[in-house]
């Protein structure tokens, strides 16, 4: 059914790609309480998702195939190496950087880089915020750190911190997802 719907949209409306939500849920493998979100490596799911991508690429070899997968890196690497783009959620890390909380690597956003993940191609669609997370500005205004008279809860300072975040975000190689509300 998914294949026929994708095919129809591609031929009828000239859609040039698809983004699938929560693809780690595209599985028939039962996941117990030790893995309630199904994030562990699942070879059967990989086969299914590759088949779906192949069906899309059979109709348009240049079509974009994007997954919000968010599973273990070993599984995402297989999909990325196959040519699939994958969501890269770095909301928490960019928020910690904007709020100036750096202890224990909380503000380390290097995971947005495909090389850090040991992927062969820049197939991380990195993002700082989406509809699933709280806005970074709100976090700065509510929980921003302070150092003497440098108060991140201050609007001017918070916006400068968010500008700095954007500079770091856009300089990392690879595609980006920019969410606007």
What are these regions (language model features)?
Residues 1-41, 52-60:
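Substrate-binding/active-site clefts of carbohydrate-active enzymes
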Residues 26, 43, 72-74:
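Acidic-and-aromatic substrate-binding clefts and catalytic sites of carbohydrate-active enzymes
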Residues 14, 47-181:
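Conserved alpha/beta catalytic core and glycan-binding cleft of carbohydrate-active enzymes
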């Amino acid at each position: 059914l998914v294949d026929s719907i994708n095919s129809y949209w591609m031929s009828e409306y000239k859609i040039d790609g698809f983004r699938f939500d929560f693809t780690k849920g595209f599985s028939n493998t039962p996941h117990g309480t030790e893995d309630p979100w199904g994030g562990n490596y699942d070879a059967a799911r990989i086969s299914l998702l590759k088949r779906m991508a192949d069906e899309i690429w059979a109709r348009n070899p240049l079509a974009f195939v994007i997954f919000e997968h968010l599973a273990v890196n070993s599984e995402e690497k297989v999909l990325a190496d196959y040519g699939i783009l994958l969501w890269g959620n770095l909301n928490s890390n960019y928020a910690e950087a904007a709020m100036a909380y750096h202890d224990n690597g909380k503000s380390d956003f290097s995971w947005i880089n495909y090389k850090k993940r040991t992927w062969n191609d820049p197939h991380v669609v990195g993002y700082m915020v989406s509809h699933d997370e709280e806005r970074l500005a709100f976090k700065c205004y509510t929980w921003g750190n302070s150092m003497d008279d440098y108060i991140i809860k201050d609007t001017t300072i918070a916006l400068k911190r968010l500008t700095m975040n954007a500079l770091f975000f856009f300089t990392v190689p690879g595609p980006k997802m920019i969410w606007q509300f």
